[in-house]
Structure formats: C-alpha cells, structure tokens
C-alpha cells in the first residue's frame, strides 16, 4: 500500500487538483493532461458527479493514476475504491480513517499540518503525507523544519502552490511532488492551454 503511494507520487512533479461539476466533455480534460505528460490527477469529492468522473477517468485512461481527494470518512474511502480510484487523499486525517485504509489495503495519502499529526500516522506505518494547507501552515520554512525530526518522511504540499512558486517547493529534499489547481482552474475549457500548462508543470523538477 505505502509502496504504491510512493511510486504514484513519483510519477509527476505536479498533481493537478480538480473539482469538476459536470461530466460532459470531461474526457478532453484528461486527454489534455496526458498529452502534457502529467500522469497523476486528484479529483476532489466536492461535487455530486465526482465519483462518476473518477469512474470515467479510471476506465478510459489506463495510463492515468486517478486519485480521489477530499476523502473524509470510511464511506468515502469505500466509494472511491469501488469507483476505480488508484489512491485516496484527505485534507487532514482521523486515526479511524487511516486505520481503515490499512484494513482494506487501499493506498492513502493523509493530510497533515504539524508534528503531532506526523507522529500519530507514522505509528501506523505512514511515510508519505499531504502537507495542507501548505502556504497557510507555515510554508516552505516550516516544511524545512520538519526534515530534522522526520528525515524519512516525504510530503506533497498542496494549498497556495502555483506556477510561480512550485519549483521552489519541489527543490526541498522532503518534497516528492506538489498538488495544485492552477493547471485547470474552475470553468477552464481551453484544452490547448491546459495541455500547455500541464507540459510546463511536468518539466518543473527536471
């Protein structure tokens, strides 16, 4: 389970975080991301069609690793697994949810914002975390400070990350990738622009 998270997060320097409110033409979004060489996506459970979008992405785009975001309960976790998601992501965590992910052997990236969160989750075997909200929780300087007591822990900072500052985040030795919504802002349907942004993002760590 944890090895799958590691290999998945290593596939793309930037994970687009998408909140999609309609199913129509959603395939074009994923095609644009793939053409832009981004292979991992997070689809948040913030809309009524999110599970359907996850199902479409999982079934039609075998080269894409489909993450489900805003997973906050056992029910959510079971639902995204059934929909075909590759992994689940939370803005925070609860010990019951983190334990349930282990019990059903489903790759899970819990959200953390402080040392106590990390200590609770490492006791369960977790080593990869979503640092959220990254900018509001202390930014790069705080993330740097976590490397001292937790040298084996890796993070996917999300929240306040954009095209201008993503490279600086990615240069930190305890950052495996970053998450961001700037690649596909809400209501954007310019697929050439999405592909262009995705291609730029895919090269940030090179």
Model-derived features: positions:
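Conserved N-terminal beta1-alpha1 strand-loop-helix module at the mouth
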Residues: 1-86, 103, 163-164, 171, ...
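Glycine-rich beta-to-alpha transition loops that act as phosphate-gripper elements at the mouths
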Residues: 19-21, 68-74, 90-93, 110-115, ...
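Short hydrophobic/aromatic-enriched beta-strand-loop microsegments
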Residues: 65-68, 86-92, 107-111, 127-133, ...
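Short, charged, surface-exposed secondary-structure boundary motifs
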Residues: 78, 97-102, 119-124, 139-142, ...
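Glycine-rich phosphate-binding active-site loops on the catalytic face of alpha/beta enzymes
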Residues: 87, 91-97, 130-139, 173-197
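Histidine/lysine/aspartate-rich catalytic loop segments that bind and position anionic ligands
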Residues: 94-127, 132-137
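Shared catalytic-loop signature of beta/alpha-barrel
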Residues: 141-162
């Amino acid at each position: 389970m944890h090895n799958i998270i590691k290999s998945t997060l290593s596939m793309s320097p930037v994970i687009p975080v998408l909140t999609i409110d309609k199913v129509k033409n959603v395939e074009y979004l994923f095609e644009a991301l793939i053409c832009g060489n981004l292979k991992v996506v997070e689809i948040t459970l913030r809309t009524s069609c999110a599970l359907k979008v996850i199902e479409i992405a999982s079934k039609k785009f075998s080269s894409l690793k489909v993450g489900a975001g805003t997973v906050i309960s056992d029910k959510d976790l079971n639902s995204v697994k059934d929909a075909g998601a590759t992994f689940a992501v939370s803005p925070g965590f609860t010990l019951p949810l983190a334990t349930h992910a282990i019990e059903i052997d489903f790759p899970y990236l819990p959200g953390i914002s402080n040392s106590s969160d990390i200590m609770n989750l490492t006791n369960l075997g977790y080593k990869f975390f979503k640092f959220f909200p990254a900018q509001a929780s202390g930014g790069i300087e705080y993330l740097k400070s976590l490397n001292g007591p937790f040298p084996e822990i890796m993070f996917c900072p999300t929240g306040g990350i954009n095209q201008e500052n993503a490279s600086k985040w990615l240069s930190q030795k305890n950052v495996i990738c970053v998450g961001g919504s700037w690649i596909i802002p809400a209501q954007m349907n310019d697929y050439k622009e999405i592909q262009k942004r995705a291609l730029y993002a895919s090269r940030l760590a090179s």
